[in-house]
Design a protein with these regions (language model features):
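Short, surface-exposed beta-edge/turn micro-motifs
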Residues: 192, 216-217
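Basic phosphate/pyrophosphate-binding loop/patch that engages nucleotide-derived ligands
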Residues: 21, 92, 184-190
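Active-site loop/lid in soluble adenylation, ligation, and acyl-transfer enzymes
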Residues: 202
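Active-site-proximal cap/lid insertion segments
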Residues: 1-7, 17-173, 198, 211, ...
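Extended, compositionally biased low-complexity polar/Lys-Gly-rich tracts
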Residues: 169-185
Length: 255
C-alpha cells in the first residue's frame, strides 16, 4: 500500500489471506502496518466532512485551511476503518476469527502542530483496541497504562494455550511486560508510569524531550530549553520556499 504519495496505489489483501492460511496446523502472528492516515491525506471521501461542520480538537487553531486539512484527515481515518473491516472479514473467512487475538493501535498522534513529534498527550496517547472472542469482554474500557514494549510479552503469554496467565520463560528479558491480565479482566491496572522520548532528529534541529505520566499527570523535561523547536514537516520549506504544510502559516498569520 502506498498512500503517502499522490497518485496513490490501491491496497491488496491477497498476501494477508495467504499468510493466514499457509499452514492450518500452525498458529500465526501477523503484524499489518497500515499507512493511513498519513499526509498528504488523499484517501477517502473528504466531501463527507464539510469544513464548516467539523468540530476541531481544542488544541488546533481554528482557521479555514486547518478545517479543510482536518476534514481530509478524518476522511482518511474513515478509509482506514474500511481497511480494518476488510482485514477482519478476511480473518472470518479463514475460520479463525473466534480463536485469534486482534490488537489495533496507532503509531502516534496526528500530523498537526502539538501532536505528532511531541511528548504531549496529543502526541503519544493513542488508541488500543482488543478483540478475542470469549476472552476479552466486548465494549469494556480500561484506564490501565501500557506501552508498545508490552505488546510482545502479551502475545507470548496469550499463545500459551495451557495457562495464558503464566509468565512465559524466555531466553531473553523483554523491555515490556504482559498486560494479558488486563485483557482477560483479571486486573484493572498494569503500569504505574509510562514514558516518552523525542529528540527531533532527523525532523529538525536537536530538541530532546523526555516525558513520564501516571495517567493523570504528565511531566515533560526539555533537555535543551534554550534551543528553538523547529519541525521540518510542519514548519520547514520545500522547493521555491513553499511550506511543507500550508496550514501552519495560517496559524501564525490568523491566530
Amino acid at each position: 500500500v502506498s498512500c503517502v504519495r499522490n497518485p496513490t496505489q490501491p491496497h491488496k489483501l491477497a498476501g494477508i489471506r495467504q499468510f493466514m492460511t499457509r499452514d492450518a496446523r500452525q498458529p500465526f502472528c501477523l503484524v499489518i502496518a497500515l499507512v493511513d492516515p498519513h499526509v498528504p491525506w488523499v484517501m477517502g471521501d473528504a466531501s463527507k466532512y464539510p469544513p464548516k461542520k467539523i468540530k476541531l480538537p481544542p488544541n488546533l487553531a481554528d482557521t479555514p485551511r486547518t478545517r479543510e486539512d482536518y476534514g481530509r484527515y478524518l476522511a482518511e481515518i474513515t478509509y482506514m476503518d474500511g481497511q480494518v473491516g476488510e482485514i477482519l472479514k478476511t480473518l472470518e473467512q479463514t475460520g479463525h476469527a473466534r480463536d485469534t487475538l486482534v490488537l489495533f493501535s496507532s503509531e502516534q498522534g496526528s500530523q498537526f502542530p502539538g501532536c505528532k513529534w511531541t511528548n504531549w498527550n496529543t502526541g503519544v496517547h493513542t488508541a488500543l483496541v482488543a478483540r478475542w472472542s470469549g476472552k476479552v469482554t466486548a465494549g469494556k474500557r480500561t484506564d490501565a497504562l501500557v506501552q508498545y514494549a508490552d505488546v510482545l510479552p502479551t502475545l507470548v503469554n496469550a499463545s500459551d494455550s495451557v495457562n495464558p496467565l503464566r509468565q512465559s520463560k524466555l531466553d531473553w528479558k523483554p523491555d515490556g511486560s504482559s498486560f494479558l491480565p488486563v485483557l482477560l479482566g483479571k486486573s484493572e491496572t498494569h503500569r504505574d508510569y509510562v514514558y516518552a522520548i523525542h529528540n527531533n532528529l532527523p525532523e529538525g534541529p536537536p530538541y530532546p524531550v523526555r516525558g513520564v505520566s501516571d495517567g493523570k499527570y504528565r511531566y515533560l523535561k526539555n533537555l535543551l530549553p534554550d534551543e528553538i523547536y523547529i519541525e521540518k514537516h510542519l514548519m520547514g520549506l520545500k522547493g521555491k520556499a513553499v511550506l511543507n504544510n500550508p496550514y501552519w502559516s495560517t496559524w501564525v498569520r490568523e491566530t
